[in-house]
Regions:
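Flexible glycine-/small-residue-rich
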Residues: 41-44, 70, 103-104, 132-134, ...
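Venus flytrap/periplasmic-binding-protein-like
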Residues: 124-137
Length: 252
């Protein structure tokens, strides 16, 4: 009954909480650009087709790489099939950013395969963020509770990823504009500095020439004074020498 299913879900969640793994997947960070997506679904499921169509025809033109890891989405073999798909993804863990587990609608009883302890424990401890879109508005499974992010439909899962990439693209565009504006401001500042230098250079040259002319005139004046003093000294010495010669002359 539905009551039994709800009780079983609570028991599994309590067990996972006691084991300390209930929120491990939720604690992972979705990469900045989650564009490499491992999809666990049925190849013939309408939900899988909706998911791929939504990604491929997003209005932003963003690229997404998706790879399907087929699994049964209803029946008694859901647990075994999804676990096998997760094992295959785990073997290539570095090739993907996120895991998306999706299926179309169906009866609530068809979701029982997603309410098992083994599947919930595996997803809770999976090394990549898991996004689930396996039910409708009123459906909530144990898998939904342990997944990083739970949405209602495959289309909503696609929109979540598109929105994430669009946010990053918008941020990068804003950053690019700020860098461009900063570059223009620096160029304008340098242009003004060069213009200022261009107006100052003639004045600087004129002042340097004036200073040099003044220094030259001062040096010329000093040289004349030194020369006059030297000539006067030499003339005085010559006069003294002539006087001595005259005093020593025998004709005197």
């Amino acid at each position: 009954t539905l009551g039994d299913m709800a009780r079983r879900r609570r028991e599994i969640l309590l067990q996972l909480e006691e084991e300390g793994v209930l929120t491990l997947n939720k604690e992972l960070e979705i990469p900045v650009l989650p564009q490499r997506i491992a999809v666990v679904s049925s190849a013939t499921a309408a939900g899988y087709g909706d998911f791929c169509h939504q990604l491929q025809h997003n209005s932003g033109g963003f690229f997404f790489y998706t790879e399907l890891f087929p699994a049964l989405m209803q029946g008694n073999q859901v647990e075994e099939s999804v676990l096998a798909a997760l094992d295959r993804i785990n073997a290539r863990i570095n090739e993907f950013d996120v895991v998306v587990i999706i299926r179309g609608g169906g009866a609530t009883s068809d979701l029982s395969g997603f309410d098992t302890y083994l599947l919930a424990a595996a997803c809770a401890q999976f090394p990549l963020p898991i996004i689930t879109g396996i039910g409708h508005e009123r459906d909530d499974t144990v898998l939904d509770s342990v997944a990083h992010t739970r949405v209602k439909t495959p289309t909503a899962a696609a929109e979540l990823l598109i929105h994430r990439v669009a946010e990053v693209a918008e941020h990068l565009e804003e950053l690019s504009m700020r860098i461009q504006q900063g570059a223009y401001m620096l160029l304008d500042l340098e242009r003004r500095r060069l213009e200022t230098l261009q107006t100052r250079i003639p004045n600087l040259v004129h002042r340097k020439l004036a200073d040099a002319r003044f220094s030259l005139l001062a040096a010329k004046k000093d040289l004349l004074q030194v020369t006059k003093a030297l000539v006067a000294r030499q003339s005085h010495r010559l006069e003294l020498l002539q006087q001595r010669i005259a005093d020593a002359s025998p004709d005197k």
